């Protein structure tokens, strides 16, 4: 049997929000997900001891704790277009929190079943009543208008999904079927990374897809320094004449 996992996400850039999530195996290779969101007030010191800007309209004066109730099997039908709230939460285990203007991005993972799993870029935003909602159109993807991005792949594979704060973009493995047979398209139990990477770049508070990026480290001036000539003799001590 598998052990349960948990994670706590907060952002060093914002420090106004903390998300706690965990999963419990339920048998038959299915997991249940549980979570809380703790939203700190803006004007007072929050739980990180950081003072923020003037309070917004309807902004609570004390930290608000929202219990998340999973919408079971929410991913069965068009998961990228599902809209949720704290009572119909698209459950997953969150691993990173990215603050944006008027919303947050969450990087998450869901075990799904014994054949496939998925990672997700979720959108968390608050309405006028300061209630949390999940899913929003902040992505600019050709021929799509998703409320979140879902990457499903084989249970045997490993996918990279991370935020690069230096370049303010999300980098992730490009997935594809292990076999080029067209019949494998959409059979996600046979999907895995193909060795290339894509990225989402933030522009005007939206995230724009950039395909086939170069993930190699950029060279700096020290990389072009002349290399030592190892054929030359280095005399540490003068020879006796």
Predicted regions and their residues:
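Single conserved hydrophobic/aromatic residue that forms the stacking wall/gate
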Residues: 1-8
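Short beta-strand elements that form the blades of beta-propeller/WD-repeat-like
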Residues: 16-23, 103-110, 168-174
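Short consensus segments that form the blades of beta-propeller domains
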Residues: 25-31, 85-87, 111-116, 186-191
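Beta-propeller blade signature
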Residues: 33-44, 120-130, 185-204
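Short N-terminal edge-element motif at the start of the domain
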Residues: 39-100
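Hydrophobic, aromatic-enriched interface-forming segments
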Residues: 91-128
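Short aromatic loop motif centered on NTY/YTY
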Residues: 93-100, 112, 133-202, 211
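Gram-negative outer-membrane assembly/targeting C-terminal domains
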Residues: 211-241
